[in-house]
């Protein structure tokens, strides 16, 4: 069962470049359907792992990586597709934070203080808000509703502020005495 659950997570990773290509080639309906499917894989891999007590170390590592890959592919795709400096600018903070946190997790693991970089509730909200923002942009593109793009910008700004704050929080936590 563990292997099957990990395959669900890997499917989400494989969906990221496909969704990106659908976005770049203006196939918004397929894009939003695949994005929804990616969201379902995120839900079901966690649900099945808990239900069947099949949580694994590789699954713990793959799941957040799959989220980050999906988010990065789509933020880059959206910044290109919408020709948006704002999305590109905010994405640079999100991507830099994710790289920094990966380095912090590696460092804390080597120092045997990995408990200091456990995922926080606010970090889960951050990921959810990032994904919601992306979904909102995709929906706006699908129905050609420009006002929703502005609303999505606001959600992404809030997500980025939380992203920066949680990065700061993790950094303080790792280097506290």
Provide a role label for each language-model segment.
Residues 1-44, 127-147, 158-177:
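Topogenic membrane-insertion module of multi-pass membrane proteins
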Residues 24-28, 51, 82-83, 106, ...:
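Transmembrane helix-loop junctions in multipass membrane proteins, especially transporters and channels
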Residues 11-17, 64-75, 97, 101-102, ...:
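Core segments of transmembrane alpha-helices
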Residues 3, 26-30, 54-58, 83-87, ...:
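Membrane-helix interface segments
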Residues 10-13, 33-36, 65, 92-95, ...:
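Residue-level signature of the transmembrane alpha-helical core
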Residues 1-9, 47-65, 107-129, 173-177:
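Interhelical loop and helix-boundary elements at the membrane-water interface
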Residues 31-38, 88-98, 153-159:
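Hydrophobic core segments of alpha-helical transmembrane domains in multi-pass membrane proteins
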Residues 51-106:
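Multi-pass membrane catalytic core of lipid/isoprenoid biosynthesis enzymes
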């Amino acid at each position: 069962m563990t292997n099957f659950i990990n395959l669900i997570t890997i499917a989400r990773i494989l969906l990221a470049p496909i969704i990106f290509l659908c976005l770049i080639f203006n196939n918004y309906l397929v894009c939003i359907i695949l994005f929804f499917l990616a969201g379902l894989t995120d839900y079901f891999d966690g649900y099945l792992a808990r239900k069947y007590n099949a949580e694994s170390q590789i699954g713990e590592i793959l799941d957040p990586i799959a989220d980050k890959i999906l988010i990065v592919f789509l933020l880059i795709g959206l910044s290109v597709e919408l020709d948006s400096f704002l999305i590109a600018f905010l994405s640079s903070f999100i991507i830099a934070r994710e790289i920094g946190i990966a380095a912090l997790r590696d460092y804390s693991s080597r120092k045997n203080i990995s408990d200091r970089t456990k995922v926080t509730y606010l970090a889960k909200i951050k990921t959810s808000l990032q994904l919601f923002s992306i979904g909102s942009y995709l929906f706006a593109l699908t129905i050609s509703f420009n006002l929703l793009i502005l609303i999505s910008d606001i959600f992404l700004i809030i997500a980025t502020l939380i992203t920066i704050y949680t990065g700061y929080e993790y950094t303080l936590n790792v280097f506290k005495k």
